[in-house]
Design a protein with these regions (language model features):
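Conserved aromatic-histidine-acidic binding/catalytic patches
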Residues: 5, 9, 52, 70
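Short Cys/His-centered divalent metal-binding micro-motifs
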Residues: 29-33, 60-87
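Histidine-centered nuclease catalytic patch
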Residues: 26-61, 71
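Amphipathic alpha-helical interface surfaces
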Residues: 13, 17, 21, 38-41, ...
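Short, charged surface segments at domain edges that flank catalytic/cofactor-binding sites
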Residues: 1-24, 104-105
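Short microdomains enriched in Cys/His and/or Lys/Arg
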Residues: 46-59, 83-98
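Short flanking/linker segments adjacent to small metal-binding domains or redox-active Cys/His motifs
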Residues: 91-143
Length: 143
């Protein structure tokens, strides 16, 4: 099985997730300055193959390479980590969305719109940072 193709929507979504977290790992809080951001990933709890939640803000977070690898290798800890952030009810909804194939078909049809939406969100977040806003910024999800 080949790697999952990274679309322009994936790039825009990743930029939003990482910039909203101030270019820092949301687990260990390591900051990644401009020019050194390759080690900071947009981590998906349910993998990108689940198109229904591929671009769902609650399914993603900014993690450094080390934390991403560690949580990926320890799924029970990853679940606990996400549960502490979102709670049981939100995790149940996320799982239902992950398994909803109609959501996946819709996302595939609207991938260009999704890319545009997250490019605009990235610009909004960038402007908020220029205006002096600090801390995690809420991302307006496409769905």
């Amino acid at each position: 099985m080949g790697a999952i193709k990274r679309t322009p929507a994936d790039k825009a979504f990743s930029d939003c997730i990482r910039s909203a977290a101030e270019w820092s790992c949301e687990r260990c809080h390591t900051y990644y300055p401009e020019g050194g951001r390759m080690g900071l990933h947009c981590s998906h709890y349910h993998g990108r193959g689940k198109w229904g939640i591929r671009f769902c803000v609650e399914n993603a977070e900014s993690l450094c390479y080390g934390c991403h690898q560690y949580l990926g290798a320890h799924p029970y800890l990853h679940t606990d980590h996400k549960m502490n952030i979102h709670g049981q009810a939100a995790m149940d909804i996320l799982r239902e969305k992950a398994n909803d194939t109609s959501l996946g078909r819709m996302a595939k049809r609207e991938v260009k719109f999704i890319a545009k939406h997250y490019r605009e969100e990235f610009k909004r977040i960038h402007q908020l940072r220029l205006d002096g806003v600090i801390g995690k910024i809420e991302i307006n999800s496409w769905s």
